[in-house]
């Protein structure tokens, strides 16, 4: 049986703390999973947000700063992993090279939306700026599920023709009929079900993994 480590939404942006990502990397070293899945929204990309465009909070945001902040956060996560891999090589111990999978989230997809809205940006900005492949990640498009050990991973799973996210882990199992893990929402949620052949299914909303408070959250969220 393989071991999976899931990193939910990290939403790195300029000025926010990232030391918890190094802790997560050290946790990966301690547990040595076979697969590491980042469920997306690692880059918050506030400079491309349409949510508060035109407000005072929007002033001073820069695309390049957003990209660099996310890269620094990812490097913090990967630093302990790379150090452990080099240690194993030096000591001639059993190698550990986990499969690393990144499912693009709606925040990363802001880059694509910006290009679609302004074709002059085509070739100037793009997912290549994230350098995910260079850092060793397999990258899957926004909402493209990747199936690993009979578990479907995606930034979120949709319900109905409108493409809106499912509202609960239980509904996710009812809609997709297989084990699924998603991020996107702040809440954690878990559900279990069993197929007619006795196969167990797991539905998981993985929650979030950042230290800061988002402005759009209320005291009840």
Predicted stretch roles:
Residues 1-75, 82:
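N-terminal active-site segment of His-dependent metallophosphoesterases
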Residues 36, 100-102, 203:
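Hydrophobic/aromatic residues located in beta-strands of well-ordered beta-sheets
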Residues 48-140:
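Active-site neighborhood of divalent metal-dependent phosphoester bond hydrolases
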């Amino acid at each position: 049986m393989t071991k999976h480590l899931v990193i939910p939404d990290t939403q790195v942006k300029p000025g926010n703390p990232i030391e918890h990502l190094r802790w997560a990397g050290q946790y990966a070293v301690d547990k040595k999973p076979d697969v590491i899945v980042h469920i997306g929204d690692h880059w918050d990309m506030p400079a491309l947000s349409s949510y508060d465009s035109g407000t005072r909070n929007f002033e001073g945001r820069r695309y390049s700063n957003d990209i660099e902040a996310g890269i620094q956060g990812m490097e913090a996560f990967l630093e302990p992993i790379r150090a452990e891999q080099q240690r194993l090589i030096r000591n001639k111990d059993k190698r550990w090279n986990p499969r690393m999978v990144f499912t693009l989230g709606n925040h990363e997809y802001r880059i694509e939306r910006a290009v679609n809205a302004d074709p002059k940006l085509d070739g100037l900005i793009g997912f290549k700026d994230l350098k995910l492949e260079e850092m060793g990640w397999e990258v899957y498009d926004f909402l493209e599920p990747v199936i690993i050990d009979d578990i479907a991973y995606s930034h979120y799973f949709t319900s109905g023709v409108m493409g809106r996210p499912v509202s609960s882990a239980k509904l996710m199992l009812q809609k997709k009929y297989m084990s699924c893990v998603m991020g996107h929402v702040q809440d954690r949620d878990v559900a279990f079900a069993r197929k007619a052949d006795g196969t167990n299914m797991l539905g998981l909303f993985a929650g979030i993994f950042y230290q800061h408070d988002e402005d759009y959250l209320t005291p009840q969220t």
